[in-house]
Structures are given as structure tokens and as C-alpha cells.
Amino acid sequence: MPLYEFTFIAQQGLTQYELEGLVKGLSSLLTKNGAELLKYEYWGLLDFAYTIDKMNKGHYCMIYIKATPSSMDEFKRKVRLNEDILRFLCLKKDKLPKGDSLMIQASQV
């Protein structure tokens, strides 16, 4: 199964508890379609370069997913219907990176 990097921005009004619930919901949606969540990173509540839906900040998150292309298409379709997710980007990757992403490393400096 191919590997995907799925980065999304959630609404700024979500609490940490609600954000964890959102990620658990995404994870269960993936497992229902035969996919697997491999890694999750929370990058923080960051400012936007421009206003999105009258919001200036959002929770940035990234997950790595192993899924078939058809199950990934179904996952993206359902994510588009979720009002808590403002934007997302899905990229196909060759391999799972080792260690933390650059966003996590930059926040630790």
C-alpha cells in the first residue's frame, strides 16, 4: 500500500480535547476503509498568512497514512465534508521519514 502525508488545518476554536477527538475520528475513518495511521504530529496553533473563513489562526497537524488509492479518495471526500477542517494537503511519499518533521524541530529551538 502506498504511503501518504496528510497535513491539515483545524479551526482555531477547537480545544485540545476536541482536536484529539477529531484525530481519533479520522483514524477510525481510515481503519474502516482498510488504511493505517502510522504517525501523528501536532505543530501547534499558528497564524495564517491571510484570513480563512474569518479566522486568523489554526491548529496545524500532520499524519502519515498507509492506504490504497481508492480508500484515500474516500477519506479525502469525507474530510472535505468536515467543517472543523479548514484546509488539507495530501502528498504521496516514498518512505516514512525518521525522527520529527522540520516544523517540530524548529519549534524546539
UniProtKB/Swiss-Prot annotation:
Keyword list, A-Z: Ribonucleoprotein, Ribosomal protein, RNA-binding, rRNA-binding
Ligase is among the record's keywords: no
CDD domains: bS6
Pfam families: Ribosomal_S6 (PF01250)
One of the record's GO molecular function terms: structural constituent of ribosome
One cellular-component annotation, GO: ribonucleoprotein complex
Record-linked PANTHER family: MITOCHONDRIAL 28S RIBOSOMAL PROTEIN S6, SMALL RIBOSOMAL SUBUNIT PROTEIN BS6M
Record's protein name: Small ribosomal subunit protein bS6
Species this chain originates from: Ehrlichia chaffeensis (strain ATCC CRL-10679 / Arkansas)
Record lineage: Bacteria, Pseudomonadati, Pseudomonadota, Alphaproteobacteria, Rickettsiales
